[in-house]
Amino acid sequence: MKLSDFIKTEDFKKEKHVPVIEAPEKVKKDEKVQIVVTVGKEIPHPNTTEHHIRWIKVFFQPDGDPYVYEVGRYEFNAHGESVQGPNIGAVYTEPTVTTVVKLNRSGTIIALSYCNIHGLWESSQKITVEE
């Protein structure tokens, strides 16, 4: 059994759990690039004490490299919890991440998200680095 056996993928326009990656298709070498990853962009995902996105991880797989590099892990820890009960707390974190990277090789951005009920979800986007 492998962890990859449990990672789901779908079209983000049909499935609310899939992380949506927003990044340019082409960038210049060593240029600062903004990457935004959102869960529930097209179809809103619940954000309740009982059902929420716990975290998003972003990776980069350079072309021709046997390794994947972790860009960051982003946790969402507030989902309406309160000592008075569920879903009446003062704060809810939304499953959206913005990060900035500099790339010197073309490759693939990979986003992985975790729903506390429906498990792991993945998406990817190719990005080309030009001189």
Curated annotation (Swiss-Prot):
- Matches recorded under InterPro entries: Desulfoferrodoxin_Fe-bd_dom, Desulfoferrodoxin_Fe-bd_dom_sf, Desulfoferrodoxin_SOR
Indicate the transmembrane segments per the record. none
CDD domains (UniProt xref): SORL_classII
What does the sequence similarity comment in the record state about its family?
Belongs to the desulfoferrodoxin family.
- SUPFAM superfamilies named in the record: Superoxide reductase-like
Which EC number applies?
A: 1.15.1.2
Q: What is this protein called?
A: Putative superoxide reductase
Q: What class of enzyme is it?
A: oxidoreductase
In terms of Gene3D superfamilies, this protein maps to: SOR catalytic domain
Q: Which positions does UniProt annotate for Fe cation binding?
A: E15, H17, H45, H51, C115, H118
Q: What are its cofactors?
A: Fe cation
Q: Name one GO molecular function term.
A: superoxide reductase activity
UniProt keyword annotation of Ion transport present: no
Q: Tell me which domain of life the UniProt entry assigns to the organism this sequence originates from.
A: Bacteria
Coiled-coil spans are: none
Q: Name the job this protein performs.
A: Uses electrons from reduced NADP, by way of rubredoxin and an oxidoreductase, to catalyze the reduction of superoxide to hydrogen peroxide.
Keywords (alphabetical) are: Electron transport, Iron, Metal-binding, Oxidoreductase, Transport
Fetch the Pfam families from UniProt. Desulfoferrodox
Catalytic reactions of this protein: reduced [rubredoxin] + superoxide + 2 H(+) = oxidized [rubredoxin] + H2O2
